[in-house]
């Protein structure tokens, strides 16, 4: 009898849980990803701009491999949100999706490559409705999807707006016990490598080689070994791991409390000017969308039918958001910053019965990896796999640049 009672209670609990979960509906997705593999951004012996012929040629340009990486990511997004969840329609619908990019060829073409995977030519596309029927001059089923490019005053994604305060904060970082030893290691390595290149000045600030080597070795590894007798895998590895903690500091990631002797919380202040804008933008847009979903047909906002909002950005941008969310370690790379084609997916859910609001965070590490749920790893979620939206709201309020990013960036410490 006792066993029967426990069985009944367990069955009831499972039924209640299932019913509760069935009322939770995915309403909105906001995603941000790093562009695909690119050429080096600078000339560095023995490889120069003329050697970078890939993807149209030039320094910093997306390569064909990078296009393929982004196309694969587009297919993964389609698999999840079109095929599995039936959340997006199978073909491009202008009111359902919106895509932004920073004003760089590599991020723009990355977005286009991703969209070619998300909305590939298919039987869902109707000739003379979705594309012109011109068999000899137009690939059947191919449709364009717009990518909106950020202007110079849009700091949410690019983090490239001038910020004097950020420059001052970097100076304050050097007063922290955690930081100075790591910076010293970087400077010593810079001097060593600069000597190999026969540099006579600017050695301390010679910081481009770790990233440049990463690009060069992918396409010109034999040339590097032939022309650089001192170069080897051990030195490459040393450069990546030596720079990793410093790259973390630049986005506000510290292992210890980053408070100066005067009481300035350097870590918090860096996050405000680096990731605060995009975190607040994402939260505010999600909150407005969920308000709209609650209103149903009475909602007149442009968000009424919008389901997916995407940012095509850079490694430091994606990393800044990981730092803000408290999960920088999931980047899982030698240099600490996200790999090519890595991405964050923030899903926003609503209980249609109670109007309770939740969010989930998913992450894709890079090429040839799946999109995985990492919600329970967020410190603000306390192990929950469906995190209350209030946790994200509190984070956004904590990191909000006040009164606005432009004014804050001009404000002295």
Swiss-Prot record:
Matching PROSITE patterns: HIS_ACID_PHOSPHAT_1, HIS_ACID_PHOSPHAT_2
Domain of life of the source: Eukaryota
Pfam families to which the protein is assigned, alphabetical: His_Phos_2 (PF00328)
Single GO molecular function: acid phosphatase activity
Catalytic activity: a phosphate monoester + H2O = an alcohol + phosphate
Disulfide bonds: 381-387
Active site: residue positions: 35, 315
Protein EC: 3.1.3.2
SUPFAM superfamilies in UniProt: Phosphoglycerate mutase-like (SSF53254)
InterPro entries noted in UniProt: Acid_Pase_AS, His_Pase_clade-2, His_PPase_superfam, Histidine_acid_phosphatase
Keyword Cytoplasm: no
Record's keyword terms, sorted: Disulfide bond, Hydrolase
UniProt-listed CDD domains: HP_HAP_like
Protein family per UniProt: Belongs to the histidine acid phosphatase family.
Record-given protein name: Putative acid phosphatase 11
Lineage of producing organism: Eukaryota, Metazoa, Ecdysozoa, Nematoda, Chromadorea
């Amino acid at each position: 009898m006792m066993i029967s009672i426990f069985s009944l209670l367990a069955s009831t609990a499972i039924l209640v849980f299932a019913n509760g979960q069935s009322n939770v509906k995915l309403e909105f997705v906001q995603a941000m990803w790093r562009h695909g593999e690119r050429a080096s951004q600078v000339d560095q012996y023995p490889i120069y701009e003329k050697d970078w012929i890939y993807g149209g040629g030039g320094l910093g340009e997306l390569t064909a491999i990078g296009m393929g990486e982004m196309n694969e990511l587009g297919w993964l997004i389609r698999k999840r949100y079109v095929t599995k969840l039936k959340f997006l329609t199978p073909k491009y619908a202008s009111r359902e999706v919106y895509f932004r990019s920073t004003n760089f060829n590599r991020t723009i073409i990355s977005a286009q490559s991703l969209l070619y995977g998300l909305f590939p030519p298919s039987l869902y596309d109707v000739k003379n409705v979705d594309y012109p029927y011109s068999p000899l001059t137009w690939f059947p089923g191919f449709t364009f999807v717009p990518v909106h490019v950020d202007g110079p005053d849009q700091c949410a994604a690019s983090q490239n707006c001038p910020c004097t305060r950020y420059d001052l904060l970097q100076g304050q970082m050097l007063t922290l016990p955690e930081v100075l030893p790591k910076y010293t290691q970087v400077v010593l390595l810079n001097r060593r490598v600069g000597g190999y290149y026969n540099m006579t000045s600017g050695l301390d600030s010679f910081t481009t080689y770790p990233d440049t080597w990463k690009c060069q070795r992918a396409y010109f590894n034999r040339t590097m070994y032939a022309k650089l007798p001192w170069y080897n895998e051990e030195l490459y590895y040393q450069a990546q791991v030596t720079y990793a903690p410093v790259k973390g500091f630049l986005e506000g990631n510290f292992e210890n409390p980053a408070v100066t002797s005067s009481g300035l919380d350097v870590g918090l202040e860096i996050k405000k000017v680096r990731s605060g804008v995009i975190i607040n933008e994402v939260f505010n847009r999600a909150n407005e969308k969920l308000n709209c979903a609650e209103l149903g047909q009475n909602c007149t906002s442009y968000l009424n039918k919008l389901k997916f909002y995407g940012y095509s950005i850079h490694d430091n941008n994606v990393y800044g958001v990981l730092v803000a969310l408290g999960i920088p370690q999931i980047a899982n790379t030698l240099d600490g910053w996200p790999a090519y084609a890595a991405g964050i997916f923030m899903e926003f859910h609503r209980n249609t019965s109670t109007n309770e609001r939740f969010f989930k965070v998913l992450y894709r590490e890079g090429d040839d990896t799946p999109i995985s749920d990492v919600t329970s790893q967020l410190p603000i979620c306390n192990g929950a796999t469906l995190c209350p939206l209030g946790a994200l709201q509190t984070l956004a309020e904590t990191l909000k640049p006040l009164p606005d990013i432009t004014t804050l960036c001009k404000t002295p410490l």
